[in-house]
């Protein structure tokens, strides 16, 4: 069995690539980072260090690696005969890898079963987006795209912090992980990945992860940044910050239980597990790394506005989520492009226009007045 994986970074090596290797796949990494690909191509193995409860070191070997820009022909050939294709490149990069994937699918031998494609990105329905981008790049003379590939959405969860200098290809990750895959597109032929969980309805799991893990992690980052703390574990060790994060997750728990029918005790246990992960002192994750890209994190269907808007539509005032968004508006890390852009927007636009631009909500939405007040308060500080 062979799996082509786009994105040879820390998540690709320390999460998706590891699970594919453990499932028995020969992993072929594709990336445009030339130095990284050169390292992988010349290495026989790398280690994944799992830290936290039950720490372990796992070795990944038997992989190959290609530069998908300068060695495109080789990547196309690998895709044409692969069993599985995965990505961990970031949702905004999918449009750049789609043409290469389309070319690989176009020359896939007719006697092979459809390639099983799964985008493992920190975004809702990322595989649907990849499918759309591949279709846009598809040459209709090659036949029916859906005859040569099957696309399944996934939800992925593993904290992979910035790595210490000098680690080389080795990756440090938390022990916890979750890879949930929609089994329905595969019919009865789902890929054999023992480390993954296959479900018939993925939507509730995607939202549970996004509105608990991502919302909580970003909340800890922004509250921690406001408190002058450096690491996420430092932030969660601060009683005031921890209480604010807990309050945020109480609100998202209320929404998830009401909307998706999760048992309250089950969701509470999930929240407790997530909070314990954030306190892991072995993960040197910084508030600056987790808080980066605040504009994306404050967008309409993301981790803050998404649940807050739904709660407001249900007649609930999401006070804790609003406090987290207020902290996000104050994330002014000069090394982060989106933080700089956010600061500029807040100085250039009036409050109502800024809310519309940042959150994509209309002034008639029930959450809009509260967000406008947050922005007005932030602008008054400037």
Swiss-Prot record:
<protein>
    <recommendedName>
        <fullName>Mannitol-1-phosphate 5-dehydrogenase</fullName>
        <ecNumber>1.1.1.17</ecNumber>
    </recommendedName>
</protein>
<dbReference type="GO" id="GO:0008926">
    <property type="term" value="F:mannitol-1-phosphate 5-dehydrogenase activity"/>
</dbReference>
<keyword id="KW-0560">Oxidoreductase</keyword>
<feature type="binding site">
    <location>
        <begin position="3"/>
        <end position="14"/>
    </location>
    <ligand>
        <name>NAD(+)</name>
    </ligand>
</feature>
<dbReference type="InterPro" id="IPR008927">
    <property type="entry name" value="6-PGluconate_DH-like_C_sf"/>
</dbReference>
<keyword id="KW-0520">NAD</keyword>
<dbReference type="GO" id="GO:0019592">
    <property type="term" value="P:mannitol catabolic process"/>
</dbReference>
<dbReference type="Pfam" id="PF08125">
    <property type="entry name" value="Mannitol_dh_C"/>
</dbReference>
<dbReference type="Pfam" id="PF01232">
    <property type="entry name" value="Mannitol_dh"/>
</dbReference>
<dbReference type="InterPro" id="IPR013328">
    <property type="entry name" value="6PGD_dom2"/>
</dbReference>
<dbReference type="InterPro" id="IPR036291">
    <property type="entry name" value="NAD(P)-bd_dom_sf"/>
</dbReference>
<dbReference type="InterPro" id="IPR013118">
    <property type="entry name" value="Mannitol_DH_C"/>
</dbReference>
<dbReference type="InterPro" id="IPR013131">
    <property type="entry name" value="Mannitol_DH_N"/>
</dbReference>
<dbReference type="InterPro" id="IPR023028">
    <property type="entry name" value="Mannitol_1_phos_5_DH"/>
</dbReference>
<comment type="similarity">
    <text>Belongs to the mannitol dehydrogenase family.</text>
</comment>
<dbReference type="GO" id="GO:0005829">
    <property type="term" value="C:cytosol"/>
</dbReference>
<dbReference type="InterPro" id="IPR000669">
    <property type="entry name" value="Mannitol_DH"/>
</dbReference>
């Amino acid at each position: 069995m062979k799996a082509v994986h786009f994105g040879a970074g820390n998540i690709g090596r320390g999460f998706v690539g590891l699970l594919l290797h453990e499932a028995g796949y020969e992993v072929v990494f594709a990336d445009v980072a030339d130095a990284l690909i050169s390292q992988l191509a010349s290495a026989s193995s790398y280690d994944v260090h799992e830290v936290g409860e039950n720490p372990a070191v796992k070795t990944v070997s038997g992989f190959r690696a290609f530069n998908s820009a300068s060695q495109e022909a080789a990547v196309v050939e690998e895709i044409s005969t692969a069993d599985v294709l995965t990505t961990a490149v970031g949702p905004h990069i999918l449009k750049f890898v789609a043409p290469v994937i389309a070319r690989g699918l176009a020359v896939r031998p007719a006697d092979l079963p459809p390639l099983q494609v799964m985008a493992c990105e920190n975004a809702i329905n990322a595989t649907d987006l990849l499918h759309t981008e591949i279709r846009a790049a598809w040459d209709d003379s090659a036949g029916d795209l859906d005859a040569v590939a099957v696309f399944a959405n996934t939800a992925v969860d593993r904290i992979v912090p910035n790595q210490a200098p000098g680690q080389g290809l080795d990756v440090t990750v938390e022990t916890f992980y979750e890879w949930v895959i929609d089994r329905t597109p595969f019919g009865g032929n789902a890929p054999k990945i023992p480390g993954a969980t296959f479900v018939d309805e993925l939507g509730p799991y995607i939202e549970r992860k996004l509105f608990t893990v991502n919302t909580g992690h970003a909340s800890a980052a922004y509250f921690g940044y406001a408190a002058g703390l450096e690491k996420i574990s430092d932030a969660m060790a601060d009683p005031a910050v921890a209480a604010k994060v807990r309050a945020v997750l109480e609100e998202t728990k209320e929404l998830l239980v009401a909307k998706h029918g999760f048992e309250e005790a089950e969701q509470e246990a999930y929240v407790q597990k997530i909070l314990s992960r954030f306190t892991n002192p072995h993960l040197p994750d910084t508030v600056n790394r987790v808080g980066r890209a605040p504009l994306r994190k404050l967008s309409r269907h993301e981790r803050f506005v998404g649940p807050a808007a739904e709660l407001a539509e249900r007649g609930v005032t999401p006070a804790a989520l609003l406090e987290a968004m207020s902290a996000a508006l104050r994330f002014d890390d000069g090394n982060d492009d989106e933080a700089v852009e956010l600061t500029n927007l807040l100085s250039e636009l009036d409050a109502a226009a800024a809310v519309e631009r940042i959150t994509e909500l209309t002034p008639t939405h029930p959450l809009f007045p509260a967000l406008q007040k947050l922005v007005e308060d932030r602008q008054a500080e400037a």
